[in-house]
Amino acid sequence: MSNENHEELNDQLIVRREKVDTLREEGIDPFGEKFIRSISPEEIETKFADKSKEELEEAAIEVSVAGRIMTKRVKGKVGFTHIQDRFHQLQIYIRKDAIGEDAYAVFKLADLGDIIGIKGTIFRTNTGELSVKATEFTLLSKSLRPLPDKYHGLKDVEQRYRQRYLDLITNEESQNRFVMRSKILKYTRDYMDNQGFLEVETPVLHTIAGGAAAKPFITHHNALDMELYLRIALELHLKRLIVGGMDKVYEIGRVFRNEGTSTRHNPEFTMLESYAAYEDYEDVMDLVEGLVSTVCKQVNGTTEITYGEYKVDLTPNWRRIHMADAVKEYVGVDFWNVTSDEEARELAKKHDVPVTEHMTYGHILNEFFETYVEEKLIQPTFVYGHPVEISPLAKKNKEDERFTDRFELFIVGREHANAFSELNDPIDQRERFEAQMKEREQGNDEAHGMDADFLEALEYGLPPTGGLGIGIDRLVMLLTDAPSIRDILLFPTMKHRD
């Protein structure tokens, strides 16, 4: 094992290794070859559930099954074991005179956790349990370590994350959650494809970290002798494709942000981003509403779900509210009538909202929203009209240029989507990038950098475009009632063990 040098072998580990030696001395490979299965334990449960003991005896149906030993008891020349394939268990009845003396000796050496192959016939025991009467027994893989207690699984949450393979063996809820994650991704792709979007792939390594306000991971390309960044968003390359005439595109991929971890944040996570030419942010609201409600219905059978203590109804039509109206409703502060940065700062001071040097009217409105409103939005709510200062890639609102045609979707007090009518004016975009650069000089290290290549692409003409970003991990958390992002990532980023 990989960490044998760092631990002393306890009695169980020693005994299991001695059994490996014994098997090899008898000419038996403890780590076997390919084994062809004709049926799974789950299929046996489904296909033969209504068959009586007599019907099964008469049919004498021969099968080939495999799985991990979860229980085992031996009495003389007879033994019983339950094997597990995923989370479906099947009882195996083993007689020495049926499988032969040599194979029975191997069975007696088997431990919980070993993976075995069985050939035999299906029957029903006197207690009514569907089982397989073995005629052949094959050891496929010897387990050198004992499994966690089968009745209690892994109680140490951190161990579940570090050793996900053990969690999947012992925790049916965890395994089902990852099956649901896979289905959510499939149904998401199906929905986007059916809406006429084309799935594409764009670079993971970027020359400029753009498309979001976040700290990047930095790497170095030796052959080109240049710094590169793991992407913090998918946006800017996808918009280039819209310029190139690919009218509706989407990508589901990993993005990387060199920031802290929490129950909602992991340094690498999965995003869906989509862009549709000749549409705006209101069209994207309709897309998101349809996507989330449809996928929820497909995986849960309903659009009414439970997340933690909350009952959430994802049935369209969802609430839509301007950010300034939301702050007015929940805080009682009317930012529509705030006319200067100084006035906004005074309001922030009065209401204990943190303000830093670079912040202006729009930043402060957003701080009010994040401090007092966001966590109160339990039912699905589109909050639109984000200030221009925090939306460098979004189109200004024609009626009030302090704001943009942008929205975020909030459910159970968390952001689940971010979208806007894309800024397609290259002159305005350059000015926004320059403003972001000034913020960076004033201490905002998450401000957007200048991307000259993207600006050049815009100068060829980006049609009016509706763009969307959805955090797939948060969506999976919501639809599977997972309290932490680590519960829906197979291998979350973890700190080194001491």
Curated annotation (Swiss-Prot):
- MF annotations from Gene Ontology: ATP binding; catalytic activity, acting on a protein; lysine-tRNA ligase activity; magnesium ion binding; transferase activity; tRNA binding
Q: Which protein family is it in? A: Belongs to the class-II aminoacyl-tRNA synthetase family.
Query: Is Repeat included in the keywords of this UniProt record?
Result: no
**EC number from the UniProt entry:** 6.1.1.6
Places the protein is found: Cytoplasm
Does 4Fe-4S show up as a keyword for this record? Answer: no
Provide the protein name. Answer: Lysine--tRNA ligase
Q: Which cofactors must be present for this protein to function? A: Mg(2+)
What HAMAP family is this protein classified in?
Lys_tRNA_synth_class2
Name the encoding gene, please.
lysS
This protein's UniProt keywords: Aminoacyl-tRNA synthetase, ATP-binding, Cytoplasm, Ligase, Magnesium, Metal-binding, Nucleotide-binding, Protein biosynthesis
